[in-house]
């Protein structure tokens, strides 16, 4: 019986210790009708520490910061059983921050990306990347 209790505690505590790596494929929406085709973004999350980063497609990165790359770190990441939400600074000019937000359903895998000051958004579906199972 003691072994069962230990096993249960060990397994339940490891649920949130794993990193979650996601590949999200979808489309970019824009006020001006323009078809970019299917795009992808990658999320790397540490569920235990509630930290992570997002790798945006170039079409979602403003020209003024493209030379810094397309990887952004979450400042605010909230994780529940049903949903993951997060925000990060896309650009910062003086005291003005352009903050982007993601909402990810842990049930359906659907992701929504929005930015308050930019008119582009992203909507798609995410699948888990098994980093320990390499394709090549």
Task: Annotate each predicted stretch with a short phrase.
Residues 14-23, 134-136:
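N-terminal helix-cap/turn-to-beta initiation motif at the start of protein domains
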Residues 39-70, 110-118:
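N-terminal glycine/threonine-rich, aromatic-flanked beta-hairpin/loop signature
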Residues 2-13:
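Sec-dependent N-terminal signal peptides
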Residues 123-136:
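Short, low-complexity, Pro/Ser/Thr/Gly-rich segments in the mature regions of secreted, periplasmic
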Residues 20-56, 80, 90-104:
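Short, solvent-exposed loop/hinge segments that bridge or flank secondary-structure elements
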Residues 58-99:
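Contiguous, well-ordered beta-strand patches that form the walls/edges
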Residues 101-105, 109-125:
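Short, exposed beta-strand-loop hairpins at the edges of beta-sheets
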């Amino acid at each position: 019986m003691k072994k069962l209790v230990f096993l249960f505690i060990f397994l339940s505590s490891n649920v949130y210790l794993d990193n979650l790596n996601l590949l999200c494929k979808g489309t970019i929406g824009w006020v001006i009708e323009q078809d970019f085709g299917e795009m992808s973004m990658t999320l790397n999350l540490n569920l235990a520490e509630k930290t992570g980063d997002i790798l945006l497609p170039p079409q979602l990165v403003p020209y003024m910061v493209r030379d810094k790359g397309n990887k952004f770190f979450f400042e605010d990441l909230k994780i529940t059983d049903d949903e993951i939400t997060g925000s990060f600074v896309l650009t910062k000019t003086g005291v003005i921050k352009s903050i982007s937000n993601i909402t990810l359903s842990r049930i359906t895998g659907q992701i929504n990306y929005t930015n308050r000051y930019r008119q582009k958004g992203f909507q798609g579906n995410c699948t888990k990347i098994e980093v320990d199972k390499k394709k090549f």
